[in-house]
Every structure is written in structure tokens, then in C-alpha cells.
């Protein structure tokens, strides 16, 4: 039985064709040897085809030449076409043969075949490069192009490589040239110019004489111009009358002095140029003040012109002498105290926030006021009112007081201000921080108003403000010294000061550059005690040393531990009586005690000489308190170190702490503080609660509370 042939499966056939098409379109990798073999076979075939075409062409030409006889030019055989008669062979032109077009067509066909073959070879090469990449060992370097390019841009020197092209010795250029322009602080000597002129004469025999003469003439003109303008000398080498505006600007920049206000005099360069009385200058020399500090250079000339003044300076900058010396000049021109006017009150009043600072100012003032015959009395808490009333029985030209106790004396009629005409507020920002704004306002309101300055431009006129009122009184002069300028301090200054001159030394609120600030992250009281013991036992720091804590209870506990380590220690905090405070400071100053453990009570204004180290056992809650704590060291131009223990509870002040350390040229921000999350941006909420030294256990006291 015959089987019938089944029809092809159409879907299968379509799938087969699709697979073949996909396989054909898919690039196939061919090994290099196979490619070389295929190329050789293709080249051989092409060569064989070319030879075959050439042989066929030659045979065709021979056959066409043998188709005519040699006698009459007629064909011996029959021809399928009629031949055209021709002349002799020598007279024929190319193409005049009986078959003129056949040879040309063959040549054109041959040329077309060659072009087609060349195009096919190029297409094949492009396909190979597209799917298999370029030949690995094929070089694209063209020696012909390279030779053309280098030959076209080649530069030929006028000498051979063996020639000596070094320049001969020239005495003019044998020495380093010096500028003939005379700059500030530098002076060109005549010897240098003469030596240069002589070198020009020796090096240039033809025109050297003329050039040297012009050089000397130019130098002489420059020297004469410099002498006329006095431009070439440093400000320290000039006389006072030769100082120009540019010199004063350089002077202020050198000492970091910035002033604001109208009709401000120039700073003083030395004590001799201060216009202070000779007797007072002798006292300054005896006390040991060799050179004035920046705040003294700027503030004393302003104060001598009877101007109100706001002095903003870092701690330890010599502010006390800056306001004491003009004060003594002022009251020395007033009538002396007698039996008739001694009960009218003092001539000058100095206010300070703490008892210790008051006593320090009193001690400093007596150095200058005692030889001049002036009396200085301090009024502070801790002493009975009877003692202070007894001290005032003979009157006093200068009173130094804390605001609280002075208000008590005013309310009990122990003191009046009928002739007070010179007011100084030292550490004004600290007085505001401690809540003395109301007592301070009461004191300033109790001053006489008859000699108050007008709030006009006349307050900037030194001649008008230096006049006497009614033959004996003078206009009241008010000064305020502070390390920072919070809004409440600005409010008081605006109310009680008249057109004040503002003197800023450095940047307000920054630590002095003589203090190296170190920060260590130490959490927990026990770890901090061990670290403090390591620091004290290292032997790197000589006494005295001050350790600051935040609360009074910590003060006693830390002092007890330090004593157990073998160090003589005293404490200073708000619960101490005045006698105990004075005894503690005296023992540290005379060397009986090596270490002082204190709260922020000793953070401002307390001057203990040669403090080598300050340790912040607890970081204060404000950066201002930190600044004043570390300001106890590095005073009077000496260097010091401040070490601060930080914990996570101090996150509110980490940003400000990082900023103030980064501004110091001798301090380095530790990596842990720099990368701490709280130090990246200023906290939006308010800082930590301010510590009240009279309180019990407020603040960050740790586990000892």
C-alpha cells in the first residue's frame, strides 16, 4: 500500500526559517588561523579568476587579429556581418578597426570587474572589523606621514650640539639684584648702590659710565623723595609728628586695635608719648610696666580727652591700668578733700561683680594712688558696715565696690554721691549675668545730674567736656569695660553713656592667643578623677594650678581627692566667708597652696600670677564662662594650657567650643569634637540653665550630687 506524502507543517517550516535567519544574522566567531586560511583561499581564487580573465582577453585579441588575410584585406571565410572597408594599417587611428567597439567594451568590463572586486574586498574588511574587531598586530603608523610632519616643523639651530653656548661672565648679573624702591621698614644703603654702579662700569666699557651715573642720580632722587615723605621708615623709627595716616593704620593692625566713634585720638606708641604727668610716669616705671598693652595704648588717650568709653577686650589684657591712670589724672585736677567736702562722697567710683575682683582692683589702685596722696577704699560683702563706715570717716577720692553692698550703704545713708564725677564699670557683662542690673541702675540713678554730659555732638568735643562747671565741677565721665557685649549691657551703655568711643582689642569673646586649649572626652566622675591625677603627676605643669567645677559640693569633693594625692589644695566658692576667700587667694599667691579648686566665682577678674594650667573638671554651661575660666592662665604675655573634660551632657556648648578653639593659632580641635553631631550646628534651643553660685546642686555635677 503506497503511503501518501504528507504536506509540510507550515508552523514548523516557519520556525525553521526563523532559526536559520537568526543563525545567519548572529555573528560567528572564527579563529585567527581559520580567518587566515579563508583569506588565502579567497585571494587565490581572485588571483586565479584574474589570470583566467586576462588569458581569455589575450585569446580574444589574437582571434580577432587572425580573422583577416594579408593580401587585399578581405576575409578568407564567410563573415556573419558585413565588414567595413579600411585603409592601410599605418593610416588607421585607434578604434578604426572593423570591430571598433569590442576592445573598448572589454576594457571597460575588465575595469568594472576590478572596481567591483575592490569594493567587495573593502566590504569584507569592514564586516570583519565590525564583528571581529581590528587586527591585533596591524600597525596604523605611517612612516611617510611621520617624516613629513617632523620635517615640516623641525627647527634648526645656528650652532652645532658640540658648541659652547654658555654666556660669558657678567659682573652686573653676578650678584642678586636689589630693589631700589624704599618700602616701609626697609632702607637701601648707599654702599649697595655704589657697588652696583661700579659693576656696571666694569661690565660695559662703552656705555657703562653713563648708565652708572643715571643709576646714582635715580638713587639720589629716591632718597630725597623718601626723606620728604618720610615713607621709608617703620613707624617705630619715626617721630610722633612724622606719623602719617598709613602709619597709624599699620600700628593699629599690629596691635589688633579697632575703634569706633567720632573724633577719636590716635593711640599712644609708648609711655613717654602718653601725655601722663611726669610723677605718674615715674610710678608706672617703678611698678614695672615697661610697654603699654594694646588696650592701654588705645584707651588712655581717649580717656584723657574726657570722652565716655566702652572697652571690649579679652581677659588678662591690662584693663585695670587702662582705666586707673586716666582716673588719677582726672581727679588730680579737682580740689583736694577737706573737712568741708569729704562728706560729699568720692570723686570716682569703680564697680566690679565680685569681692575678689574688687580687692584686686583696690590693691592695684593703691600702687598708683598712694604716692599721689589719694585714698582708695573698698566696699564689699563679708565685712560689717561699721568697719566700712569707719574706713570712710576721713573721706576717699576713690571707692571700689560691688553693686549689692554699695546699694546697702546708699540705702542706710552711709554714703552719698554729691560730687562723684567719674564712673567705671569693670566686667559689666558679668555684673549683668549675676543679676546686678537693678542695683547697677539704682547706683547710676543716684549720681548727680548737674554735671551730666549732653547727648549731642558736643559730647565728642574734648575741649568743651574738659571745662569746669560753676568753677569747680566737671562733666561726668563714664567708662564701661567688658569682655562681651550682650544686649542688656548695650542697653545700659545707651542709657548712661553719652556718645561713647568704642575700643575693641582682638575679637570680643575669644580666648587669648597665649592659651593652648585642649579638650578630652572623659565621661564619669571616677574617670575624670583618674585623668586629673595623671595630669598633675606628669610633672609638666608647675604650680599654681586652678581646677574649675560647676557646683560648690563638687568643689569640696574634688579638693579632698587632690589632697589625698599629696597636693596642698584650697577651695573658693560662694559659701566661703570673705575672710576664707581672702585667705585662700593669699595662700595660692604666696605659694603655700599649689592647687586652687573653684567655681565660676574665680572665673573672672581674679589675677593669680604665673598660673601654668587651668583644668575644667566640668565644662561650664556657656562659652563666655569658658573664655573667662581659661583666661586665668596665659596672662601678662606668658603662655599657659587649659584642659577641658567633656561629656555628652555638654552638647549645648560643643559647637561654640569648636568655633573658639578653631580660631586659636596654637590650639587644635580634637577629631572627636570635630566629628561630634552636636558640634556640627548651633543648637536652636536655648543653652543650658545658668548656674547660680549661691545655689546648692544645680548644673552638671555628675554622680557626686
Curated annotation (Swiss-Prot):
**Domain Helicase ATP-binding positions:** 300-503
SMART domains reported for this sequence: DEXDc, HELICc
Feature: compositional bias, Gly residues: 696-705
Show where the record puts the motif Q motif.
Answer: 269-297
Keyword field contains Protein transport: no
Q: What does this protein's UniProt record list under function?
A: ATP-dependent RNA helicase involved in mRNA splicing. May destabilize the U1/5'-splice site duplex to permit an effective competition for the 5'-splice site by the U6 snRNA, resulting in the switch between U1 and U6 at the 5'-splice site. May also act to unwind the U4/U6 base-pairing interaction in the U4/U6/U5 snRNP, facilitating the first covalent step of splicing.
* Domain text: The Q motif is unique to and characteristic of the DEAD box family of RNA helicases and controls ATP binding and hydrolysis.
The protein in question is named: Pre-mRNA-splicing ATP-dependent RNA helicase PRP28
**Gene from which the chain derives:** PRP28
Amino acid at each position: 500500500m503506497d503511503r501518501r506524502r504528507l504536506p509540510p507543517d507550515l508552523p514548523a517550516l516557519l520556525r525553521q526559517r526563523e532559526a536559520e535567519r537568526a543563525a545567519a544574522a548572529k555573528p560567528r566567531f572564527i579563529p585567527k588561523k581559520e580567518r587566515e586560511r579563508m583569506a588565502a583561499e579567497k585571494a587565490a581564487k581572485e588571483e586565479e579568476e584574474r589570470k583566467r580573465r586576462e588569458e581569455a582577453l589575450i585569446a580574444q585579441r589574437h582571434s580577432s587579429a587572425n580573422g583577416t588575410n594579408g593580401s587585399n584585406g578581405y576575409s578568407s571565410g564567410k563573415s556573419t556581418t558585413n565588414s567595413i572597408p579600411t585603409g592601410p594599417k599605418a593610416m588607421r587611428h585607434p578604434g578604426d578597426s572593423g570591430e571598433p567597439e569590442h576592445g573598448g567594451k572589454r576594457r571597460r568590463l575588465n575595469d568594472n570587474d576590478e572596481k567591483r572586486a575592490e569594493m567587495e574586498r573593502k566590504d569584507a574588511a569592514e564586516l570583519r572589523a565590525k564583528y571581529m574587531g581590528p587586527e591585533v598586530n596591524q600597525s596604523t603608523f605611517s612612516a611617510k606621514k611621520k617624516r613629513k610632519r617632523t620635517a615640516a616643523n623641525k627647527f634648526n639651530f645656528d650652532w652645532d650640539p658640540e658648541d659652547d653656548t654658555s654666556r660669558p661672565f657678567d659682573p652686573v648679573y653676578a650678584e642678586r639684584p636689589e630693589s631700589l624702591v624704599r618700602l616701609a621698614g626697609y632702607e637701601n644703603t648707599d654702599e649697595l648702590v655704589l657697588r652696583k654702579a661700579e659693576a656696571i662700569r666694569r661690565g660695559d666699557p662703552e656705555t657703562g659710565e653713563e648708565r652708572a651715573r643715571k643709576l646714582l642720580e635715580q638713587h639720589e632722587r629716591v632718597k630725597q623723595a623718601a626723606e620728604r615723605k618720610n615713607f621709608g621708615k617703620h613707624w617705630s623709627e619715626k617721630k610722633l609728628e612724622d606719623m602719617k595716616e598709613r602709619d597709624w593704620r599699620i600700628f593699629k593692625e599690629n596691635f589688633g586695635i579697632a575703634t569706633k566713634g567720632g573724633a577719636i585720638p590716635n593711640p599712644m606708641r609708648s609711655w613717654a608719648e602718653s601725655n601722663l604727668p611726669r610723677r605718674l610716669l615715674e610710678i608706672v616705671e617703678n611698678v614695672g610696666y615697661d610697654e603699654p598693652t594694646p588696650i592701654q595704648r588705645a584707651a588712655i588717650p581717649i580717656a584723657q580727652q574726657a570722652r565716655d568709653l566702652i572697652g571690649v577686650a579679652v581677659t588678662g589684657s591690662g584693663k585695670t591700668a587702662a582705666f586707673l591712670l586716666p582716673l588719677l589724672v582726672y581727679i588730680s585736677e579737682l580740689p583736694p578733700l577737706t573737712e568741708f567736702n569729704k562728706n560729699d562722697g568720692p570723686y570716682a567710683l569703680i564697680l566690679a561683680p565680685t569681692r575678689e575682683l574688687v580687692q584686686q582692683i583696690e590693691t592695684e589702685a593703691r600702687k598708683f594712688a598712694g604716692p599721689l596722696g589719694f585714698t582708695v577704699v573698698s566696699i564689699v560683702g563679708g565685712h560689717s558696715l561699721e568697719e566700712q563706715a569707719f574706713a570712710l570717716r576721713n573721706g576717699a577720692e576713690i571707692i571700689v565696690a560691688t553693686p549689692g553692698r554699695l546699694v546697702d550703704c546708699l540705702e542706710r545713708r552711709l554714703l552719698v554721691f554729691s560730687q562723684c564725677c567719674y564712673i567705671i564699670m569693670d566686667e559689666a557683662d558679668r555684673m549683668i549675668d549675676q543679676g546686678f542690673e537693678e542695683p547697677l541702675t539704682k547706683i547710676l540713678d543716684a549720681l548727680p545730674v548737674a554735671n551730666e554730659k549732653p547727648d549731642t555732638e558736643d559730647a565728642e568735643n574734648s575741649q568743651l567736656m574738659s571745662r569746669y562747671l560753676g568753677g569747680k565741677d566737671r562733666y561726668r565721665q563714664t567708662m564701661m569695660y567688658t569682655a562681651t557685649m550682650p544686649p542688656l549691657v548695650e542697653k545700659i551703655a545707651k542709657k548712661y553713656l553719652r556718645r561713647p568711643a568704642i575700643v575693641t582689642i582682638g575679637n570680643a569673646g575669644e580666648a587669648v592667643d597665649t592659651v593652648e586649649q585642649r579638650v578630652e572626652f572623659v565621661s564619669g566622675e571616677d574617670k575624670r578623677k583618674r585623668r586629673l591625677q595623671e595630669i598633675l603627676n606628669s610633672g609638666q605643669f608647675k604650680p599654681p594650678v586652678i581646677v574649675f567645677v560647676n557646683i560648690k559640693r563638687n568643689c569640696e569633693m574634688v579638693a579632698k581627692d587632690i589632697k589625698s594625692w599629696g597636693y596642698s589644695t584650697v577651695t573658693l566658692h560662694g559659701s566661703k566667708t570673705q575672710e576664707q576667700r581672702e585667705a585662700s587667694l593669699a595662700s595660692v599667691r604666696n605659694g603655700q597652696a599649689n592647687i586652687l579648686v573653684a567655681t565660676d566665682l574665680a572665673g573672672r577678674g581674679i589675677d593669680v600670677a604665673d598660673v601654668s594650667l587651668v583644668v575644667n573638671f566640668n565644662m561650664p554651661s556657656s562659652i563666655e564662662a569658658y573664655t573667662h575660666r581659661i583666661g586665668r592662665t596665659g596672662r601678662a604675655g606668658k603662655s599657659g594650657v587649659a584642659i577641658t573634660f567633656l561629656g555628652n551632657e555638654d552638647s549645648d556648648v560643643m559647637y561654640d567650643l569648636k568655633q573658639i578653639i578653631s580660631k586659636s593659632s596654637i590650639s587644635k580641635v580634637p577629631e572627636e569634637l570635630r566629628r561630634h553631631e552636636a558640634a556640627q550646628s548651633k543648637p536652636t534651643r536655648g543653652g543650658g540653665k545658668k548656674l547660680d553660685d549661691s545655689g546648692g546642686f544645680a548644673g552638671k555635677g555628675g554622680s557626686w550630687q
